[in-house]
């Protein structure tokens, strides 16, 4: 039985080991003394760290790789036809879902699980950064600059992790504390409708052993709170509703910093500031500060950590920010390239609003829609997602393994976006050419959960060459 004592270097095999969630667990299990191997057909920035830790990573799926494994870990994205998964089933190897393994780790500790349709990576990363002095175990869905990784084993009782609602795997968890940032319509191909998503979150909150910290700025969560059993301990937070237990007011922006006063149960705790823009990030910071105080982190430590926190990789990730000659009378232009994971309409709108609040330059959103099913189900919600930009460029939809059963395209999405300057560009070379010809100060934000980050990095590298 896993965690029943390591016997002769028990062997764990991860199918899809380079994924952001799978790789974090692989690192933790390696540090716990397990013999860890895995396979993934996609090589990325995570692979090098896994190899440096002595983890064997195969670049193809083959049943020979799995032979001798005591356990196989697979995410729900792995198809039943996968040869490694088939071999494990046919040979009696214990198979765990990624979410099951994460829950087994977290449930044994003072687990703090961060859930929500949007903001869970930023919130869990921010909490991890603020709690570093307490030496927590960390498993988050992005690369946290403070630890240069998405995972870190800790020696204390604290375990900070994201809770994934997309496939209901967060229902394996029984955390001591839970943070719920919001609920929105997403992954409808799995859940069917919004009410089913709410029911899943209610179950998750009921699994929480001590305290659930819930955002009242989300109307869906407000309703969920009314449907919870009376015996559940709930603490609320808000930047709009002063009845919340944790409340931020007197919000202002100075020198690209967001400053606010924090009140807990009507008592002024003090003034705090963030170096990442947007009201949604103030919301994200409120449960972080509250929990850090609860676990004994000083106000000075909290503020210092918040000042240093720049977000995790692919969350408002500035890749390039320099002045370049524009070729017209040797005048200079300031060009900023930003990489961001936002792919749901709500995330896109919040991110672009936040950038517009601190950036006066021309703003261009270059968006790669993610999954045919998501575009189909959320088509109407994309209508006002881009109201804060000067131009929208759409790439073809990133399939993420889906078949186009809905016969939908970026051209159709273009017709639903409420903006008079939307263009579809099918080739990366066209986008590179467009960015290189800019004549005025501009910020280009590359958005999506597919491979658009690679394009953003390529353009940033080319601009670096132009600036030398």
From Swiss-Prot:
Where it sits in the cell: the answer is:
Cytoplasm
Q: What class of enzyme is it?
A: ligase
> Gene3D superfamilies attached here?
Mur ligase, C-terminal domain, Mur-like, catalytic domain, NAD(P)-binding Rossmann-like Domain
Which InterPro entries does the annotation name? Mur-like_cat_sf, Mur_ligase_C, Mur_ligase_C_dom_sf, Mur_ligase_cen, Mur_ligase_N, MurCDEF_pg_biosynth, UDP-N-AcMur_Ala_ligase_MurC
EC numbers listed for it are 6.3.2.8
Q: Which reaction does it catalyse?
A: UDP-N-acetyl-alpha-D-muramate + L-alanine + ATP = UDP-N-acetyl-alpha-D-muramoyl-L-alanine + ADP + phosphate + H(+)
Q: Name one GO molecular function term.
A: ATP binding
Key word Kinase present = no
**Role, per record:** Cell wall formation.
HAMAP family assigned to the protein according to its UniProt record, in alphabetical order: MurC
Return the protein name: UDP-N-acetylmuramate--L-alanine ligase
Q: Gene for this protein? A: murC
């Amino acid at each position: 039985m896993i965690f029943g004592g390591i016997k002769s270097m028990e062997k764990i095999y991860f199918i899809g080991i380079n994924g952001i969630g799978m790789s974090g667990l692989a690192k933790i299990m390696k540090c716990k003394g397990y013999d860890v191997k895995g396979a993934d057909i996609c090589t990325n920035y995570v692979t090098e760290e896994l190899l440096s830790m002595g983890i064997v990573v195969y670049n193809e799926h083959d049943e020979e790789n799995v032979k001798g494994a005591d356990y196989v870990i697979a995410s729900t994205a792995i198809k039943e036809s996968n040869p490694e998964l088939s071999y494990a089933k046919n040979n009696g190897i214990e198979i765990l879902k990624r979410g099951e393994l994460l829950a087994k780790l977290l449930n044994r500790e003072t687990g703090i699980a961060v859930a929500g349709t949007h903001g869970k990576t930023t919130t869990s990363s921010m909490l991890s950064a603020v709690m570093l002095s307490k030496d927590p175990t960390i498993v988050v869905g992005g690369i946290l600059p403070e630890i240069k990784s998405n995972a870190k084993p800790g020696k204390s009782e604290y375990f900070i992790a994201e809770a994934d609602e997309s496939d209901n795997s967060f229902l394996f968890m029984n955390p001591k504390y839970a943070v719920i940032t919001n609920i929105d319509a997403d992954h409808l191909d799995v859940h069917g409708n919004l009410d089913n998503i709410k029911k899943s979150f209610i179950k998750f909150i009921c699994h929480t052993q001590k305290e659930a910290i819930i955002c009242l700025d989300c109307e869906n969560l407000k309703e969920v709170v009314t449907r919870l059993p009376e015996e559940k301990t709930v603490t609320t937070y808000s930047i709009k509703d002063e009845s919340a237990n944790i409340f931020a007011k007197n919000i202002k922006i100075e020198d690209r910093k967001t400053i606010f006063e924090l009140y807990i149960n009507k008592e002024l705790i003090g003034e705090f500031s963030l170096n990442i823009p947007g009201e949604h990030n103030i919301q994200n910071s409120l449960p972080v500060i509250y929990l850090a105080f609860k676990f004994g982190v000083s106000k000075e430590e909290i503020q210092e950590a918040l000042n240093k926190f720049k977000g995790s990789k692919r969350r408002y990730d500035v890749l390039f920010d320099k002045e370049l000659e524009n070729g017209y009378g040797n005048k200079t232009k300031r060009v900023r390239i930003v990489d961001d994971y936002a792919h749901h309409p709500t995330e896109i709108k919040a991110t672009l609003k936040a950038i517009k609040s601190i950036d006066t330059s021309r703003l261009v959103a270059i968006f790669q829609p993610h999954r045919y099913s998501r575009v189909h189900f959320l088509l109407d919600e994309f209508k006002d997602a881009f109201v804060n930009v000067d131009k929208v460029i759409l790439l073809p939809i990133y399939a993420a393994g889906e078949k186009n059963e809905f016969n939908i395209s970026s051209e159709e999405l273009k017709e639903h976006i409420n903006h008079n300057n939307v263009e579809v560009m099918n080739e990366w070379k066209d986008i590179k050419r467009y960015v290189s010809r800019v004549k005025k100060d501009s910020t280009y934000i590359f958005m999506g959960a597919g491979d658009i980050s690679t394009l953003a990095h390529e353009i940033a590298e080319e601009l670096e060459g132009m600036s030398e």
